[in-house]
Each structure stands twice: as C-alpha cells, then as structure tokens.
Amino acid sequence: VGNSGVSIATLDDMKELYAGFDLCAPSTSVSMTINGPAPTILAMYMNAAIDQQVANFVGVNGREPNEEEHAAIKSQTLASVRGTVQADILKEDQGQNTCIFSTEFSLKVMGDIQEYFTQHQVRNFYSVSISGYHIAEAGANPISQLAFTLSNGFTFVEAYLARGMAVDDFAHNLSFFFSNGMDPEYTVLGRVARRIWATAMRFRYGANERSQKLKYHIQTSGRSLHAQEMSFNDIRTTLQALIAVYDNCNSLHTNAYDEAITTPTEESVRRAMAIQLIINKEWGLAVNENSNQGSFIIEELTDLVEEAVLQEFEKISERGGVLGAMEVMYQRGKIQEESMDYEMKKHSGELPIIGVNTFLPKDQSEGVVEVELIRASDEEKHEQLDGLRDFQARGADRASAALTELQRVALNGENVFSALMECAKVCSLGQMTEALFEVGGQYRRNV
C-alpha cells in the first residue's frame, strides 16, 4: 500500500478519490505527481472522468447511453478534462532513480500518450510536466536544474518529431515544473527558461507562437525547509513565492512549514495557502507584472544564467545528448557533486542557515517542536487491499484477455496508451505493470 501519496490501485480507487468533483468542469484541474506508472494512472483518471459523465447521462435520461452516445460522451470528456500528469521519465532517472520500466520503453509510451492526445483532441491536459523540481531537490544548483530540465524538454520534442508528429500538434501539451530556492539565480529562472525555449522552438523547430510559449509551475523549495525552528520555514517560503510571482510563473505551490518532517497538517496547509493569498490580494506591488524588470541585477542575472545554461547544453551534447549523458551518469554525477557541496557548506557554516547553523537559541530545546507523524493505519491498509481483491474478482473473466491484448499491442509497436485505456477498466495497476514488465523490460537502478 505504501506511505507516500494516495494509494491508487484500481479504477474504483480513482473514482472514490474524485467523488464529488466534476472532472469536466472548467474550474477543475488535476495535477498528478506520478512518473513510472504514469500512463496507467492517467488511463484510470480518464476512465473515471468518462464514467462520471456516463453516470450524469443516466441520471438525466434514466437509461444507459447507446454506443453512439457513449462515443460522443467519451469524445466530449477527453476534450474537456483539464490537468497535468508528471510522467517525466528522464528526470526520474537523473534525479530520483524510481523508474519501473526501461527508459526506452517509457519514452515510447510517453510518445503514445501524446499521440493519443493529438488524435482525440485532448487539448487542455498536459501530457508531461517536464520537471526540474526533483533534480533540484536531489541537490542540483539552479543552473543545473534549468539546463537539465530544458535539455530533457528538447529531447521529448525530438522524440515526438521522430515519430512523425507535428510540433504545433503537441507543444501546447508540454509544461514545465521548477523549484524556487534561496539562490539569486532563481529570481530569473523563469525568464531565462522562456527565452531559451522560445528561441529554439521558433528558429530550430519552426513552431508557431503558441508553441513558443513555455508554461511552468513553481513549487517552493522543499530542501530549504528545516526541522530546526520550523516556524522559520514560512519566511523562506514567502520569499521564494514572492520571486516566483515577480518572475511570472503560471502557477505556484507554497510548501507547508512542517513538510520538513511529516505530511502537513490542516493548520500548516492553511498557512501555506495564506502566503499566496496575502501576496496576491494584499501585497500592492504584485498587481504589476514583471515588477523587477529593467533593474540592473535582473538584467545582468538573466544574461549570466542564460550563458551558463547554454554552456551546460554543450557539455551534454559532447556526451551524445541527454540519453548519451545519462548512460555515463553525467547528470546524476553532477547532481551528487552539487548536493555534497551544499551539505558541506551547510555543516561548516559557510552557507548560513538561520536557526540551523547560526542564530541558534540559547536553549537548544527551544527549537524542537513535537509533531505527530502522519501514517496510514493497519486498518486502512487492509481496507485498501480488500478493495483491490474485490475489483480483481469482479473483472477476472475479462482481465486475462485485456492483459494479453495489452502485451500484443506493446510487442507490435502499437499505441500502448490506447490499450491501457481499455485495460484499466478491468485490471489493477499491479496486473498491468507486471504484464508490461514482460514485454517492455524492467528498469535496473544505478547507484
């Protein structure tokens, strides 16, 4: 069952999670932080949304839709759902080491998702969130975070183009996800990313204006949260949120102060949300976009960071591009070096961190706060397992054929996501994963 995130093993779990939410409402947008099994989880979500609209049809008409009506409901649902699935398998290898399928197979299925989105006019859902956040959390400095993330993004573009997709058919389905820390480079991270992306998309790929626009989400730095004097974490988060707003991020997540040690509480989440609300509704300067634009430090930093990122691109190219660099563990090695540098400076005091290595309370116990660690109970875990077994029993007569078809599609190089959309109706996450292991290969972790 696990302890991190929500346990979603079946379509029933997905429906229960979103019960009460209209998944096709313009005001509903769902972001799913899932990577290795992202295609399967995404298929469950899409089916949950379709089934929800079918249930609405039954409620209004008092009958099940016929085949033509069901097809229309499915088409309308896919065109309406809004959200993001993370799915970035490149950063998963570089920064987290938690892939489940082979990298090549994972890239192929990512392309299948985008191809399915293009064919079914899924225009409001991002097929991937190209993520630098995890790279930063693993230890990378802001330059490496931005360079690795953008190079990963261009790798996806090249992979999709190689499959025959037109750049303007998929570029709008790509989004980015960055961390904002305390270093000065974070102040211009968004504007540098947009400058590099727009230039490449226009002049290298011939993309239209919409495709040149880089859309990105910012989450304040989890690594900057400390267990010592946790109340100070809100101050750090506020500063990081402020520069994110000044840099015109498209969306923002502010961390709760107690995430340094546990799942946040209702109180800490409310405080984190208040940070955004106060900036947006009370802080006067926030009404103006690009408040810092034109200042010497912003313009200078923008040019310096862009040059540093382009130099990192050259180093990656010298190693055969992103995939070639991954084979020699270039990105992972650089992340480890920068993480070690950060930790050494933190422990030596060269990098001052208030309440951690300087400005310490006279009584060290003053900074210690008793916090309940939130974990799933054994009863909750057994309830989840019982639900899984019940779902598998109900679909047993159809699951075997669905899994066989899934493997056939994968072996023949057809669209795996299309098959997952059917398979998810009667098979669990584990069943589909095991079936794909046999034909797609299993990821072997590197140290």
Language-model-detected regions and their locations in the chain:
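Catalytic alpha/beta active-site cores
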Residues: 1-180, 185-186, 204, 213-217, ...
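Glycine-centered flexibility sites
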Residues: 2-5, 132, 137-139, 164, ...
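Conserved active-site and cofactor/substrate-binding residues in soluble primary-metabolism enzymes
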Residues: 9-12, 36, 40, 44, ...
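Generic secondary-structure signature for well-ordered alpha-helical cores
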Residues: 19-23, 50-54, 111-123, 151-165, ...
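Alpha-helix initiation/capping motif
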Residues: 22, 77, 88, 102, ...
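A short glycine/serine-rich beta->alpha loop
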Residues: 29-34, 138-142, 224-229, 260-262, ...
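Flexible, glycine-rich loop/tail regions that form catalytic "lids" or insertion modules at the edges
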Residues: 62, 274-277, 281-447
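Active-site capping/gating regions of soluble enzymes
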Residues: 147-156, 175-355
